[in-house]
Amino acid sequence: VLVLSHLHSGDTPSAASNKAQLESFRQVSAAFEGIESSLSASAGIFLGPEYHFDLTRPGIALYGGEAVNGMKPLRPVATAEARIVQIREAAVGGTVSYGATHQLERASRLAIASVGYADGYLRSLSGSGIPLRTGGIAGGFGFIAGHHVPVVGRITMDLTIFDVTDVPDGAVRSGDYIELFGSNMPVDEVARAAGTIGYEMLTSLG
C-alpha cells in the first residue's frame, strides 16, 4: 500500500502548482499514518528533498535524460546504434529515398543503416521530404568515426540513409555501427531534432 501522487508540472520548476500540490499531498499523506508516500518522479526529484517523501520514482533520470528541459545533471547512459548494411557512392544531382526529396549537391558517399520507423526511429528525423517540418526542425544526425553525419532523404520503414561524405575514406565500412543517440548525441538533443521529447525516443525504439 502506498499513498501516491504525481506532479503535473514538475518539469517546470517555477510553476506555482508544484508548491500547491506539495502542500495538498502533505495533508493527504498525513491522514494515512504509517503508510509510505511518494510524490516525485524524475522531475520532482530535482525540486528538492521536500518533494521526496518516503520514496521517489525515477524514470528518464535512470537513462541520464533531461527530466527538466535544459537541465543536464546526469551522464547519459542509454545508447542506440544501427548496423550499416551498405555504402554507396552517388553522383551529384542524384536523388535519395522515397519521393526523391533530397537532391545531392556534390558527389557523395552514403551509408545505409538497418533502422527505420518500424524500429521506432522516428520518421520526423528524416533529412528532407517531411511536409509538416517547420523551420525549427532540421532533421536527424548519426555519429560515427568521430563525425556527426546527417540523415538524408526520408527515413523508410526499415532503412535510414546517412551522408558520410565528410568522414575520411575507409573510416566507415559495411558492418560498422552508427550511433543514433548516446554519449556523443544525447537522446534529448535527438528528440528535439524530431520535434518531440526524450521520453518518446526511449519508449519507441525496440
Roles of regions detected by a PLM:
Residues 1-92, 168:
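Active-site loop/helix belt of alpha/beta enzymes
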Residues 91-206:
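C-terminal accessory subdomain/extension
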